[in-house]
Curated annotation (Swiss-Prot):
SUPFAM superfamilies: Aspartate/ornithine carbamoyltransferase. This is Aspartate carbamoyltransferase catalytic subunit. Catalyzes the condensation of carbamoyl phosphate and aspartate to form carbamoyl aspartate and inorganic phosphate, the committed step in the de novo pyrimidine nucleotide biosynthesis pathway. PROSITE patterns: CARBAMOYLTRANSFERASE. Pathway: Pyrimidine metabolism; UMP biosynthesis via de novo pathway; (S)-dihydroorotate from bicarbonate: step 2/3. It comes from the Bacteria. Heterododecamer (2C3:3R2) of six catalytic PyrB chains organized as two trimers (C3), and six regulatory PyrI chains organized as three dimers (R2). The gene is pyrB. One of its GO terms (biological process) is 'de novo' UMP biosynthetic process. It comes from Pseudomonas putida (strain W619). L-aspartate binds at residues 99, 184, 239. Carbamoyl phosphate binds at residues 71-72, 121, 151, 154, 280-281.
């Protein structure tokens, strides 16, 4: 296994093209816009009788999910299949990692299968970055979510949802509500919104679920839902991540819903044409009431549809960036 050249930006090739997709941190606005534009072009594929394009024909994409996720894994599988790639999905519950094998050893064995791309989801922050640093240079790595750190494809599908429903980001007010502390989605959304020029990004939640120093992301912090939702264009609700919480951060789910649950009455404080989003899975009656989740403002199911197109864009762009870098390396070696 040969590490990537330390002088080269890990996510980009020498021409500034995507070769891994690990985080939205530091990626230029132009590249994020290119991902959105490419995803827009792929939405048409989903409406065809034969939902395939040959961009990744002959390539193998390996989904390595050390953490459960039905929605993310399924959309990555569909995205790769629609690009005509061969797809392998590792069932971690029956893999050698449950028998004590290290992440590094698992990586080496997967690499021996000659996959061209790994889509990695892991409960430890930085796992995808570690794999990208140590994998064979020809293999692209996509972060499907790592700990509390990042979920870049979710961030981009959220941006595509906002752009398709609201157009430009430059005059929007966006509220992110709920368990900010444990949410990799919140971090990715904040980075993307800032990079794309959104002037008013708000985070709303109890003090115990808002990270210290979050203002560095360029956001306004609210601990009152009614105040925070005033005149917003977009509301992004987050799931309470009980599995990541230590005791004492939250009195009860009922108390959270009483203070921070999105109801029809509370949504009335937002703009009349506001949209409501949620990365899923939804906890009805905890962070959102059914009348809102299923109502006219909800674009939650649209997010799922757009997610396939965004992941098609990321897979195809990263594979193209790897191919370009391989050609550059070969030319430089001559």
């Amino acid at each position: 296994m040969t590490p990537i050249d330390a002088k080269r930006p890990l996510q980009l090739n020498d021409q500034g093209q995507l070769r891994h997709f690990l985080s939205l941190d530091g990626l230029p606005r132009e590249l994020l816009t290119e991902i959105l534009d490419t995803a827009d072009s792929f939405l048409e594929v989903g409406a065809r009788a034969v939902k395939k394009v040959p961009l990744l024909r002959g390539k193998t994409v390996c989904n390595v999910f050390f953490e459960n996720s039905t929605r993310t894994r399924t959309t990555f599988e569909l995205a790769a299949q629609r690009l005509s790639a061969d797809v392998i999905s590792l069932n971690v519950s029956t893999s050698s990692t449950s028998k004590g094998e290290t992440l590094f050893d698992t990586l080496r064995n997967l690499e021996a299968m000659a996959a061209d791309m790994f889509v990695v989801r892991h409960s430890d922050s930085g796992a995808a970055h570690f794999i990208a640093e140590h994998v064979c240079p020809d293999v692209a790595v996509i972060n499907g979510g790592d700990g509390r750190h990042a979920h870049p494809t979710q961030g981009m599908l959220d941006m595509l949802t906002i752009r398709r429903h609201k157009g430009s980001f430059e005059n929007l007010s966006v509220a992110i509500v709920g368990d900010i502390l444990h949410s990799r989605v919140a971090r990715s959304d904040m980075l993307a919104l800032k990079a794309l020029g959104c002037p008013d990004i708000r985070v709303i939640g109890p003090k115990t679920l808002i990270p210290i120093g979050i203002e560095q992301y360029g956001v306004k912090v609210y601990t009152d839902l009614t105040e925070g939702l005033k005149d917003v264009d977009v509301v992004i609700m987050l799931r309470l991540q009980r599995e990541r919480m230590a005791g004492g951060l939250l009195p009860s789910e009922g108390e959270f819903y009483r203070l921070f649950g999105l109801t029809t009455a509370r949504l009335a404080g937002a703009k009349p044409d506001a949209i409501v989003m949620h990365p899923g899975p939804i906890n009805r009656g905890v962070e959102i009431e059914s009348a809102v989740a299923d109502g006219k403002h909800s674009v939650i199911l649209n997010q799922v549809t757009y997610g396939i197109a965004v992941r098609m864009a990321v897979l195809s762009m990263a594979m193209s960036g790897q191919n370009t870098q391989r050609q550059l390396d070969q030319e430089n070696a001559q």
